[in-house]
Amino acid sequence: MNRLDYSGVKPDWQDAIASFFASQTGRVLADFIKTREDAGAIIYPPRPFRALELTALAETRVIIVGQDPYHGPGQAQGLSFHVPAECKIPPSLRNIHKELQRDLGIARPSTGELTGWARQGVLLLNAVLTVEDGKAASHAKKGWEALTDSLLRLVAQDSSPKVFMLWGAYAQSKEPLIGQHHLILKCNHPSPLSATKPPVPFIGCGHFSRANVWLKQQGLEEIHWEKFTDSEPIQNSFLF
């Protein structure tokens, strides 16, 4: 398996990815990952570009910026905050579910899946797309950030208005990449370490309802936040 095979991503991302891997930074990153694999390192996720496979640039309406993948077995799937159905829901994602319930009256799901969001135009993009087993941030500052920054710029340069959700200081460091005609929502990271603390607690931020109000004002379709998976029925919520 070629972990860096991006042939499955949506066509409107492919030129940016090809340009990156043709660059010196991209070649260094590819060499680093191959060297680590050859040394026996266990690297997650198996499909680093999954977010770009599920959400086309042209269909992106909301961007949720993550930092790097989960580093436990079977967790990371190439989508920020998402875990597959068989995995225990991580604490940050539990707080996302908690805020959805508080904000929109959405019942907390039994799954940590977010593919239903991705297929509606929510780009779940981590800044770093690979990690080694048990070693958080082990592939940070190896080159991924140059690619994902370029993707964020590409999204921001698109003429269609978008919502950027920047949770925590790291995600907020990406704000200079974003243009003024988009809605930027900022608060603390949903981690239990910061979700209820100043300056802007995640619990109580109201980002999900605020995003939908703004999208509707722009003449765009709202996100059905209760649709966590492809098969999930749409629930009624408190947003009118």
How should these model regions be labeled?
Residues P233-F240:
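Acidic, low-complexity intrinsically disordered tails
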Residues R3-I17:
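Generic N-terminal amphipathic, Lys/Arg-enriched alpha-helix
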Residues P11-D12, S19-L166, Y170-I178, L183-N188, ...:
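A polyanion-binding, active-site-adjacent surface
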Residues M1-L4, Q235:
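Intrinsic-disorder/low-complexity regions
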